[in-house]
From Swiss-Prot:
Gene Ontology terms: biological process: apoptotic process; negative regulation of extrinsic apoptotic signaling pathway; negative regulation of low-density lipoprotein particle clearance; positive regulation of apoptotic signaling pathway; positive regulation of intrinsic apoptotic signaling pathway; reactive oxygen species metabolic process
Species in which this protein is naturally found: Mus musculus
Name of protein: Interleukin-19
Chief location category: secreted
Effect of disrupting the coding gene: IL19-deficient mice are more susceptible to innate-mediated colitis and develop more severe inflammation in response to injury. In addition, mice respond to vascular endothelial growth factor (VEGF) significantly less than wild-type mice.
MF (Gene Ontology): cytokine activity
PROSITE patterns per record: INTERLEUKIN_10
Record Pfam families: IL10
Function: Cytokine that functions as an anti-inflammatory and proangiogenic factor. Polarizes adaptive immunity to an anti-inflammatory phenotype through induction of T-helper 2 responses by both down-regulation of IFN-gamma and up-regulation of IL4 and IL5. Produced by osteocytes, stimulates granulopoiesis and neutrophil formation. Exerts its biological effect through a receptor complex consisting of a heterodimer of IL20RA and IL20RB. In turn, activates the Janus kinase (JAK) and signal transducer and activator of transcription (STAT) pathway, and importantly, STAT3.
Amino acid sequence: MKTQCASTWLLGMTLILCSVHIYSLRRCLISVDMRLIEKSFHEIKRAMQTKDTFKNVTILSLENLRSIKPGDVCCMTNNLLTFYRDRVFQDHQERSLEVLRRISSIANSFLCVQKSLERCQVHRQCNCSQEATNATRIIHDNYNQLEVSSAALKSLGELNILLAWIDRNHLETPAA
């Protein structure tokens, strides 16, 4: 009887440890202070959203991001950061030096996040599923429907959606 209880206990502990390990593999933790990125965004948010003339259009859909499966989070995050780096930050034309400094700070922070993701990809090989590829394509299609400068401005104004999603999916939750 003791052997059976010990075997059951051992099996139970093994399953618990495996589930914890699998859960940790779902997430790719990033080593960037998101509060600094959020602070820079909040300092330019009003300027971006005031200039936005397409109030009823969205490029970065919260519903689209919520549909991302845990196994695609690393891939989708990398896709979104690449989108912002290669399209939004490049396409945006800004006259205010202060806003430019804030955008540059955000862009540099995104590069640091991407470096963290590269390390994660090396160790965990986070590949993109078809759903993640489709979600990325939808964002690019939404962006392409607007004139370039309007699309860049709109995307900058929607950074809070991306930042909240990154917070929810990449930051380590404190132990209870």
